[in-house]
Amino acid sequence: MSSNLIKSFGLIAIGAISGVTFTHFYYKGYQGSDVPDLTPRYTKFDSAGRALESIYDFNATKFFQYGIPGPVADQRVNHGYMSVFDRRTRNPFYTAETITQESLNQRKGNRRYSEFVPDDNIPEMFQAKLGDYRGSGYDRGHQVPAADCKFSQEAMNETFYLSNMCPQVGDGFNRNYWAYFEDWCRRLTSKYGSVTIMTGPLYLPKKNERGQWEVQYRVIGNPPNVAVPTHFFKVIIAEKSGEPTSSPSVAAFVLPNKPIADNFPLKNFAVPVEVVERASGLEILSNVPKGNRKQLCSEVVCQLNVKEFVESVKQKQKNQGK
C-alpha cells in the first residue's frame, strides 16, 4: 500500500496548475476586459534618458492594512490533547495526545455526562455544527478517543468538541475496526512508559475511469461545509521508561474511511512516516533523525485483537449494569 500512496502523492501538484488557470479565467470573467493595469511605481533610465526597466514592487504592508486573510490554523490545547483545526474542511489538521498506564487507569470521567458541542474557540462561520452531521449517514468520529481521557470529567468532555471530530463511516469502521485500532494503541502502554499519538484526516487521490488521478470527497452539512476524509492516519511515537526521547519507537498507519473486515491485518496499513507527511503537509518527528527511530512493529505485534476488545466492552457494560 505504501508504494502506491507514495506514487500517487507526487501527482497532487498537477491540481495546482489547473487551479491557477481557473482563477485567471474567473477573474477575467468577473471583471470583463477591465483587468487592472499594474502601473510601475518607478522606472530606471539610462544616461540618455531612455527607459531601461520598469519595476513594480507589491506593497504587502499596505495590503495587510485591509486585514490579514490567513490562512489560520486554530490551535487548541486541552487537558488531554491538542488539536489544530482546518477552517476550510471543518476538520482538524491533526490531533495529538500522550497516554500512559497511569493516565488510563484514572476513571474519573464518564461519557454519559459528555455532549457533542461546537468549538467556540473557532469563529462561528468556520465551525462544524451538530446539524452538519444530522442525517448525513456519517458518525461524528473522535480523533482523540474519549476513552483516552478518563482521568477527569472535564478532560473527557473536551474530546466531544466537534473540532475533535471528522465524518467517519459507522458500521465496519468507526464502530468496529477504528475502535479496535484505538484499543490496540492503548494496550501499547503495557510495554511503553508513554505513547504519543498523532491522528488526522487525509484526502487522497485515486484514478478515475479515464485513468487520471483526482481527489474526490463528499461534503456534508447545509450549506455543505464539512469535508468527508477519504482516509485517516495515525502516527505512534512510543518511549520506554528511562530511555532517551531522541530514539523513540515509531509506526505510521493510513486507513481508508470505509468498512474494513475485522480480520484484515493492521500491518497492511503501515506506511513510512514520510507518506503521511507528503499527504498531510505536516512535518512529523523533524527533531528525530531517521536513524534514531526504531520500528515499533519490530518490537510488538502490529495486529488487532478483536476478541479481547469485544470481551472488554461486554465486561464494562456488565459492570455498569450493577
UniProtKB/Swiss-Prot annotation:
Predominant location: mitochondrion
Enzyme class, spelled out: hydrolase
Keywords (A to Z) from UniProt: Endonuclease, Hydrolase, Magnesium, Manganese, Membrane, Metal-binding, Mitochondrion, Mitochondrion inner membrane, Nuclease, Transit peptide
InterPro entries, per the entry: DNA/RNA_endonuclease_AS (IPR018524), DNA/RNA_non-sp_Endonuclease_sf (IPR044929), Endo_G_ENPP1-like_dom (IPR001604), ENPP1-3/EXOG-like_nuc-like (IPR020821), His-Me_finger_sf (IPR044925), Non-specific_endonuclease (IPR040255)
Positions annotated to bind Mg(2+): 174
Keyword Ribonucleoprotein: no
Other observations noted: The active site contains 1 hydrated divalent metal cation that has only 1 direct interaction with the protein; all other interactions are via water molecules.
Protein name: Nuclease 1, mitochondrial
Organism listed in the record: Schizosaccharomyces pombe (strain 972 / ATCC 24843)
